[in-house]
Amino acid sequence: MNFNFELILFYAVLISGIIALFDQLFLMKKRKQVYAKETKGMSNPPELKLPILIDYARSFFPVLLLVFLLRSFLYEPFRIPTGSLEPTLAVGDFILVNKFHYGVRLPVLHTVVYPNNNPKHGDILVFRWPPNPSVNFIKRVIGVPGDKISYIDKTLYVNGQKINQSDIGITNNRDEEGRLWEVKEKMEDFFGVKHAIYINDARYGEDFKDVVVPEDMYFVMGDNRDSSADSRFWGFVPYENIVGKANYVWMSWDSFDHKIRWSRLGKSVN
């Protein structure tokens, strides 16, 4: 079952707001009149107490509304659940995603009301997964509309241009089950965006050639090239599925060693 926090938060704001407004318009005046009659002549009257439901609604509504507006239009926190973007993003990284970088979208409906920047080569994009839009994915933008993408012998080609890779060395990559895999770490220069990638020669990489990215679509891949479910397998990301651009790591928890990765805190995502 997928946990749709955005929808739950929306209903929480709506219900608490309706209760608080109904009380303000119809119940508060009568309650104060009854209180005034009951405490008339008292030198030290007790504090006027609200019904518990109304008290909770009035207390939580402004907080819920503020959180809803911040995460809908400014920044939203996400947790990285898999290693598909390693070594750039580690499992257990908590990141902030800029929600307005690619335009303002209505919460819940996700309709664009104010277009802004379009995704560029090398951007790390959070989006609603096309096969199941209730699930959020995060990948790197490899192809923008009109690009011709090829992937041959684990090397990228964009519009016929080979994307240069330089060797960093051999390292171990741990998967979600804790198993270690020996991988090659390389530095990829992707149109000026330099970032490390993992290549696992023990895993088969299916080649493809001259895949053209359609209008209003994007081709995305993980930096952990042989351990990423991405556009190579399920297709393109439509513009309307975009959630935002990953910006910073604000927390990182190593679930295997049970500790905070202090060195990753505040790291810029690129």
Q: Where are each of the predicted segments found?
A:
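Transmembrane alpha-helices and immediately adjacent membrane-cytoplasm interface residues
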Residues: E47-R79, F100
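Transmembrane helix-loop junctions in multipass membrane proteins, especially transporters and channels
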Residues: M28-A36, E76, I80
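Membrane-bilayer interface helices and TM-boundary transition segments
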Residues: E76-L85, V126
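Small-side-chain structural scaffolding
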Residues: V63, V67, S72, S84, ...
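Soluble "head" domains of membrane/secretory-pathway proteins
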Residues: N2-K30, E38, P45-L53, P87-N270
